[in-house]
Amino acid sequence: IGETVLTGTINTTGSQTYQSDVTIEGDVELNAGGDISFSDEVFGNQNGSAGDPDLTINTQADTTFGGTVSNLATLTTDAGGSTIAKADITTTGNQTYNDELVLNTSLTLTGGNASFTGGIDGDGNDLTLNFTGNATLDGGSTTISGINNLTSLGGVAANGTITTTGAQSFEGNATLIGNTTLVGPSATLAGTLEGQEHDLTINYTSPTTISSSGSNINNFTSVGDVLLNTTAFETIGSQTFQGNVTLTGDTMLTGTSGSFANGLDGDGHSLTLNYFNTTTIDGNSVFNNLNAVSY
């Protein structure tokens, strides 16, 4: 079977099945009453000065990408059904999944911005998000589950509960668009944390490394152990550390109040507590290896 070239709008009352490589010539819209299936590669062909083409898919059934998707400007799927991805998807612009995105393998999504309105089912696979803008992970209005390792190389806009069975790595900046809870075995928060006055709870079984100073986070809660790899960590509201806290350098903590339930290891560094209200240090906890403590 030879290559298939798609142009314009294609409407079917039943399914659409493309068993060979597909080239998208110009902006294409596919409307189907049944499944839409691509067995091999989907490739966008530049249309002169118009640039890479857009691909819009509308079906209440399943859309399956069996091969890589590349050279598209934007990719948009409608609500209802699911999008099943079996390989990497790359766009120069935005990716909008209004239906559930199901990972059939570990893969990377690359583009401008990403929206997962229909949720994500990782099915035990790894997901890497490589977007120059923000990838919006809204666990408040939809379900994000089944992802093993989650890595974001660019920005993330987060809300609700985001749970992984493997590690979470946020290499870019993270923005809270609602009260957010992150759950998994371990995490690295390497970029800035912009809270937009929302609460952040991190619940990891292994120590979490925080390298950001934090900005406009309301209440912060860490259920597990934390490594503070920053000179300052600031919240608008309270800071609650339920696990062990370890300093990797001199650190100032600023907020309305602080609570340390399980001790702090200064590792030879200085700690400044800049809380406006009461700082609670549990009597069973131990503050040790501190160079100096300032209140």
Task: Give names to the regions the model predicted.
Residues 1-295:
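Extracellular lectin-like interaction modules
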